[in-house]
Amino acid sequence: MNTRKYSIVYCTPALYSAGGTERVVTMKANYFAESFGYDVSIILTEGYGMPPFFPLSDKVRVINLNIGFEELWEKPFWEKVMLYLKKQYRYKKVLQFELFRISPDITISTLRREINFINDIDDGSVKIGELHLSRADFRGSSSGTPNVLSRWFHAWWRRRAVASLRKLGKFVTLTDKAMSEWPELSNIIMIPDPLPLDVKVQSTQQKSKRVIAIGRYAYEKGYDLLLRAWELVEKRYPDWSLDVFGMGNRQPYEQLLTELNLNTEQCRLHGVLSDVKKEYPNASLLVLPSRTEGFGLVLLEAMAFGVPVVAFDCGSGPSSIISDGDNGFLVQPFDIKGFAEKMMQLMENGGLRRTMGNNGVQKAQQYTIDKIGHQWKQLFDELMQNGI
């Protein structure tokens, strides 16, 4: 067994928010430092002066370059492009300085802005990219309704990315389905996200009449679809409640809740959770109404607590975790009535909830941090032994 202590650098935008990528990067960095004794650094571009949202080991160093790409989000398209190029130039310069200073064995990118130049930095480290999105969502426009020039620009940008991905020492996706979306790449493998380290696999009692949803308040998370489905559910099961937790702007969804005349005592929209695992033991069902989902970590978390799940069969994430009818339900995108029917099927059948919950517990055991962490260690060992 290879016991070499590698020096690892992660490049990711930020750690200050409660996003899935932030959580997974934090988990893996902690595990590599604490369990394998690796020298781990995380290089950020955003959130200067802001603490990590998730607990970070004292053994992990954080270097914030204070580039500020997030300042460009609300800028007009062409102004955004010009400012982006200036920030990108600065980012390349200071990241190159840090990589030569640290001299890591391995540099891991979450494939944001640094993918444009990471392979050109000749610091001697093996470059790995890990993608937390489907191919369709990678480098997509975030402007809502992009104009023709914006769509053309992002299409060109995605094509350019393929050349950069091909140069990586290894390109890691989270699911087999996501891996199949890149047939032109031969340097690709699949390693899923891990179940959070502090979640103990256990089973809830399935007695509460409570449904939960966890994720950002954003269009792609589909909470508008969920509220419309809940409108159907509430008519038949007024004694059940729905609690939604997430960061972001709740106002559009609060407005929709009012427009649909939903019972605000039974349908509640909350802010972000500092400790999400406290909610699962008091839930009998988790729903994931996302329009697109690269993985779906909350599905695994719910399963670890024996909570059955309902999700739209979107992207590559949910179908890699949910076996339809076994540990949850997959619903045809974006069938609101079908989503409501699957929720109600579980609400009215406690035995089915318990059976699916128990099956989910077994599924979650496949994703422990020990198992996933050792898959990463095996990859590191292979890359270093091969001198890639």
Predicted regions and their residues:
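Short, structured helix-loop element that forms part of the nucleotide-activated donor/catalytic region
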Residues: 52-55, 243-264, 270, 352
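A conserved mid-protein helix/loop that constitutes part of the nucleotide-sugar donor-binding site
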Residues: 19-27, 209, 213-232, 252, ...
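Aromatic "clamp/platform" in nucleotide-sugar-dependent glycosyltransferases that forms part
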Residues: 272, 291
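Short hydrophobic beta-strand element within catalytic cores of glycosyltransferases
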Residues: 308-312
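Membrane-proximal helix-turn-helix segments that form the acceptor-binding/catalytic region
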Residues: 93-101, 150-170
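Carbohydrate-associated surface elements
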Residues: 177, 194
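N-terminal strand-loop element at the rim of the active site
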Residues: 11-18, 31, 35-82, 181, ...
